[in-house]
Regions:
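Hydrophobic h-region of N-terminal signal peptides that target proteins for export
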Residues: 32-42
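N-terminal catalytic cores of secreted or lumenal carbohydrate-active enzymes
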Residues: 48-217, 230, 237-244, 252, ...
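Structural recognition of the beta-strand scaffold that forms the well-ordered cores
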Residues: 58-64, 104-110, 161-165, 218-222, ...
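Noncatalytic carbohydrate-binding groove/subsite architecture in carbohydrate-active enzymes
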Residues: 207, 237-374
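Aromatic/acidic polysaccharide-binding cleft in carbohydrate-active enzymes
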Residues: 346-431, 440-446
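Carbohydrate-binding surface patches
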Residues: 446-489, 519
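Solvent-exposed beta-hairpin/edge-strand motifs
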Residues: 484-501
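C-terminal beta-strand-rich structural cap/linker in extracellular carbohydrate-active enzymes
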Residues: 506-527
Length: 527
């Protein structure tokens, strides 16, 4: 050592001061580094509990209202084919990337005739519908041609299930001669002597579509959002309120009409506008509240429909208005699950889009192509499936304009369409979780974070497993997936994120643990 070297005690500061200023900070720096490394390497373990099956998943879907009627009439057939592929295809391209989201149920809006009335319908042009039934009582099977084209395109691409729903009875049968309620009150807009006529119209229409288009309808919803207070404010779009007694009466007539036509179509009750209307009285009165007990308790003698041969023991409703605050979203779905269990019925979520109270993403106005809306909706899907035990899940409109109600943004004048991250986010579920899959419980040592990781798992009928992991956070998250039976599985990962091209993109093979990208949805498919 050079004898002229300056030792610490020759510095103008003391040894203790030098140590506190220079050595201790370095010690804490390295301690922080090692702690961070240890934290990063310690991935959260999510365990699929193979002995804890939950509900059977029937399908994922969307509806043809209202855009498919006009899109189906475009001259640009290539664009129609592209849209149909995005919605219905289960094929992959040469790189193994899905061409579409593989919807497994398609909701067809059976029209009431407001389009034929034109301006006198008091309904916005874009939400009017044609009717197969004509004034003279005959049927015109050339009506609703755009919608029928997409029925065929869906079937050609292998969609296995079809559902018909109505917002109004045909205008010939309504009390005001319109397909909208025009503020007339909270009772059904249907003449008292036309219940059987309305039922025959529905059955005849489904029979005709089967004969002319080769489409069999598995399900029929005679009413739509009958408890929605908007339904008796009108006019804006087709719609009618109804009391539970009126709905039960219509269900009985519809049951007879379907049987007479030799159809095994099932009648769904009752497409409530808000799941809170299933549990109690919400923004309405007793005649439209407590839908579950009203329709499925034998003690409800005037409204019980559980004894009808073509009414399955399930309730269909819409998840609007119940997605914020986030803790409440979970709570109300758990309440719904317990109420369904009490009466021995299942739950289907048949319609949802972004509404004005979805403040976290700025409400429904203005289309959003990004993961902001996609992640928000994925969180709703996760809650509906894992807390409400929904057996079926459907988005509202397949295609729409400058509002957050369409999976695909369409430009009518240009006759073209643009996909969105929302479309592919639904595909993280619909493309890989096929009809008949069973959801299994997933456990973790950490409490689920609706702003972080949300994980659910499913086993398809072919025995292959599927796991969907949502990373809602702005940071990558370490992730480890295992099974309670300790068996090893190899997974192909498909990711949707804001990264260009990551629309169900295959991003590698998973065997142990990995890091989930920030603001992404990853689907793990067993190889």
């Amino acid at each position: 050592m050079n004898s002229k070297a300056k030792f610490p005690n020759s510095l103008p500061i003391s040894i203790s001061t030098w140590t506190n200023k220079f050595i201790n900070p370095m010690k804490y720096y390295w301690l922080l580094v090692f702690t961070t490394i240890a934290t990063v390497s310690r991935a959260t373990d999510y365990t699929i509990e193979t002995s804890q099956p939950r509900q059977t998943i029937r399908h994922f879907g969307a509806s043809d209202a209202w855009s498919m009627q006009s899109i189906g009439l475009w001259d640009n057939e290539a664009e129609q084919e592209k849209i149909a592929d995005w919605l219905f295809s289960t094929e992959n391209d040469a790189q193994g990337q899905p061409k579409g989201i593989g919807l497994s149920v398609w909701r067809f809006n059976l029209g009431a005739g407001s389009a034929e009335q034109g301006r006198e319908s008091q309904i916005n042009p874009g939400t009017r519908t044609e009717c197969f039934l004509t004034k003279d009582g005959t049927y015109d099977w050339t009506k609703q041609p755009g919608q029928r084209k997409f029925l065929r395109m869906a079937k050609q691409r292998g969609v296995p299930h079809f559902l018909a729903f109505l917002n109004s009875a045909p205008v010939y049968f309504t009390q005001n001669g319109l397909a909208t309620n025009t503020g007339r009150g909270g009772t059904i807009n249907l003449k008292d002597d036309c219940y059987d006529d309305f039922a025959r119209f529905m059955a005849t229409s489904l029979k005709g579509l089967e004969e002319h288009e080769g489409i069999h309808f598995d399900y029929l919803c005679p009413v739509n959002e009958p408890d929605g207070h908007w339904n008796w404010l009108g006019p804006k779009q087709e719609g009618s309120p109804a009391t539970h007694r009126e709905i039960a009466r219509l269900a009985r007539e519809t049951s007879k009409a379907l049987t007479e036509q030799g159809l095994n179509t099932q009648i769904l009750m009752d497409e409530s506008s808000d799941i809170r209307c299933l549990l109690g009285v919400h923004e309405t009165d007793w005649q439209r509240g407590h839908a579950i007990s009203t329709f499925f308790s034998p003690d409800s003698t005037l409204t019980y429909v559980g004894n009808l041969p073509n009414v399955p023991h399930l309730i269909a409703a819409h998840s609007y208005w119940t997605n914020t605050p986030v803790p409440y979203m979970k709570k109300v779905r758990e309440q719904l699950r317990e109420e369904c269990k009490k009466y021995g019925i299942k739950f289907w979520q048949t319609e949802i889009c972004i509404m004005s109270n979805d403040n976290e993403i700025g409400g429904g106005g203005g289309y959003d192509f990004t993961m902001k809306t996609a992640l928000y909706v994925a969180r709703i899907i996760h809650h509906d499936l894992t807390y409400a035990d929904a057996e079926s899940w459907s988005w509202w409109r397949a295609c729409g304009g400058d509002y957050k109600d369409g999976l695909i943004r369409v430009y009518e004048r240009q006759q073209n369409a643009r996909d969105s991250k929302l479309l592919w986010a639904l595909g993280n579920y619909s493309r890989f979780i096929r009809p008949g899959a069973v959801r299994y419980q997933v456990t973790s040592p950490k409490q689920e974070d609706p702003y972080g990781l949300m994980v659910s798992a499913y086993q398809n009928q072919d025995g292959k497993w599927v796991c969907v992991a949502i990373n809602y956070s702005n940071e990558p998250q370490d992730f480890k997936l295992s099974f309670s039976d300790k068996k090893k599985h190899t997974w192909q990962i498909y990711r949707t994120s804001d990264t260009e091209g990551e629309n169900l993109k295959p991003v590698g093979i998973y065997k142990g643990k990995m890091q989930l990208s920030a603001l992404s949805i990853s689907t793990f498919v067993e190889k």
